[in-house]
Regions:
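N-terminal single-pass transmembrane signal-anchor helix
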Residues: 1-34
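Short glycine-rich loop/turn motifs that provide flexible caps or phosphate-binding loops at active sites
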Residues: 5, 19, 46, 63, ...
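Residue-level preference for alpha-helix termini and adjacent loops
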Residues: 6-9, 32, 41, 72-74, ...
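N-terminal hydrophobic or amphipathic segments with adjacent small-residue motifs
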Residues: 14-18, 40, 58, 71
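Short alpha-helical interface patches
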Residues: 19, 27, 35-40, 89-100
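Membrane-proximal N-terminal amphipathic helix
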Residues: 37-63
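Periplasmic/extracellular, small/polar-rich flexible segments of pilin-like filament-forming proteins
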Residues: 58-140
Length: 140
């Protein structure tokens, strides 16, 4: 009797079935990694905006113009438009160091986004309320 080498058909089928089950279980976990990366990116942009808001507001207080409807602050050689002590929508992206190469920046609405429902919405300050930055990662 010869000594057979190799796998039988049943062994090969079982290996394929096991690999299929593993792929079915593991694939959903890896499939959403892009969404997680987009969410982390937009949350990072939101954090940068909030930091820029604090820095500009601090500089406005130092300059004594935090109550003015419009003014400017210079940060690292860049002139930032300021409304009531906080960056204006038109200059929040440059104040936060957000590149238009990476994000869609709409200075009219104050929305900085990667895609729909994956964005940061910046609202200008008013005489009675501070500026706000709201992060939405529901569509990332």
């Amino acid at each position: 009797m010869k000594n057979a080498r190799g796998f039988t058909l049943i062994e090969l089928v079982m290996v394929i079935v096991i690999l299929g089950i593993l792929a079915a279980v593991a694939l959903p976990k890896f499939a959403n990694l892009q969404g997680d990366a987009r969410a982390a990116s937009i949350q990072g942009a939101g954090g940068a905006i909030k930091s820029a808001m604090a820095i500009v507001h601090s500089q406005s207080i130092i300059n004594g113009d935090e109550g003015d409807a419009t003014s400017t602050v210079t940060l690292e050689g860049t002139s930032i438009a300021v409304i009531y002590g906080y960056p204006a929508r038109t200059s929040i992206a440059s104040a936060a160091g957000i590149s238009t190469d990476d994000y869609a920046v709409n200075t009219t609405t104050g929305v900085i986004s990667l895609q729909t429902d994956c964005d940061v919405t910046y609202t200008n300050a008013t005489a009675t309320a501070a500026a706000t930055a709201v992060t939405d990662v529901s569509g990332c």
